[in-house]
Amino acid sequence: MDMELCMQFRDKVNENDLVYHIYRNRDGKNQWSIICSAMDWIEVVADSIDSSALSLKNDNASSVKLMTFVVCIDVLWEAVQQLHRVFIDSNTIPFKDDDSVFVKKQFPMKDNQYFKTIRA
């Protein structure tokens, strides 16, 4: 992941107090804390995720690395959903009907559902 892109987003959000003042109490909800939490988790994932550590070996260490990779993707997805709920629309799911990420699926389903299946 591109850490520089994450930092640019954080810098843009923190560029002035406008975002803070708009979202600290929006419709009685503190959405500023949601934004900050999502930015923090995206940064953690961007700093930690390492697809090069994945291996084709069938051993415990490889299983743990794969599990960590899937958890990182899941945390990233949750953070993106939270930002979507705050900035775009709280009633829709981003990329709901997308099927461009998993191009060689084992099962015919949209990417969101397919990832849930992998994660399970």
Where are these regions (language model features)?
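Histidine-centered, metal-coordinating catalytic motifs and their short helical/loop contexts
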Residues: 104-120
